[in-house]
Swiss-Prot record:
Main location: cytoplasm
A Pfam family of this chain: RF-1
PROSITE patterns: RF_PROK_I (PS00745)
Protein name in the entry: Peptide chain release factor 2
Modifications after synthesis and translation: Methylated by PrmC. Methylation increases the termination efficiency of RF2.
Domain of life: Bacteria
Similarity comment: Belongs to the prokaryotic/mitochondrial release factor family.
SUPFAM superfamilies documented for this protein: Release factor
Keyword terms of this UniProt record: Cytoplasm, Methylation, Protein biosynthesis
UniProt cross-references to InterPro entries, sorted A to Z: PCRF, Pep_chain_release_fac_I, Pep_chain_release_fac_I_sf, PrfB
GO molecular function: translation release factor activity, codon specific
Amino acid sequence: MELSEIKRNIDKYNQDLTQIRGSLDLENKETNIQEYEEMMAEPNFWDNQTKAQDIIDKNNALKAIVNGYKTLQAEVDDMDATWDLLQEEFDGEMKEDLEQEVINFKAKVDEYELQLLLDGPHDANNAILELHPGAGGTESQDWANMLFRMYQRYCEKKGFKVKTVDYLPGDEAGIKSVTLLIKGHNAYGYLKAEKGVHRLVRISPFDSSGRRHTSFASCDVIPDFNNDEIEIEINPDDITVDTFRASGAGGQHINKTESAIRITHHPSGIVVNNQNERSQIKNREAAMKMLKSKLYQLKLEEQAREMAEIRGEQKEIGWGSQIRSYVFHPYSMVKDHRTNEETGKVDAVMDGDIGPFIESYLRQTMSHD
């Protein structure tokens, strides 16, 4: 890349950031941050823990936007200063470093713009992600477990914290189901792109004849709603609460008493399990919160369905069908059927590199809104 081209790219980035700044209202956001931090410094701040956590989350979200912009602008200013130095005295190694910075910077701007677009009413929330294997016994249970690992690795790379709240191992290998609580800013905003059916094609390690098998697993994702977001009353007569002994994933704490909780909500048919906490009381509280989140999501989807009917739209809400195929044999390819995004780097995808699929889907849905 010639120096003149490097300069054109730097100038373009400066223009992009100026345009982004115009839509951000940074001064107002910084004022809000100051107000939130004054609230957080008050001695009675933690009297209402739910309200306190809400303020902390809002403050962190604003700081992510403001600091994200300032970091990008500082990087562009540094690149500009380096270019000026190269004009005064050329240095081949410095030029190579600057060229690489210019190339890498585009991805950083794209990622930041995507964060700004995640402005849905619940995008900033934590996420509850569930995996269930399709028919096919051990083969599909192993596939669900592979997806479980894929999402764990993706979340690690994004800086999200993952808590396994329910885990049911498969008969021979894999899992029959798993429920994850994923904590982090915009966790739901990103992971909502994964809701649907995932298809695997491979030579089965469980088939002595070495035949090719197709397996399916479903992924469901809902926001983890804060208590003050949910206007749901649950009639005690509508639920059954059962206790059972926690099974636990490998290496996790396994209770010797029946501290795990299963709540069945009969009107909706929703069943939630929680075995992450060490006490039955805490597991029950966590399970009730999860049940409320599921019922509230159900209510929101019903409202969205009604609005779609009013507008005459045929937009499917809910699980939908197959969203992505992972082909290990006879060739290597992962393809998203909603966006046609694809890659031959199957191992990287299974190691959590699903960002391009998520971002492609989010940009497509945002452009259609």
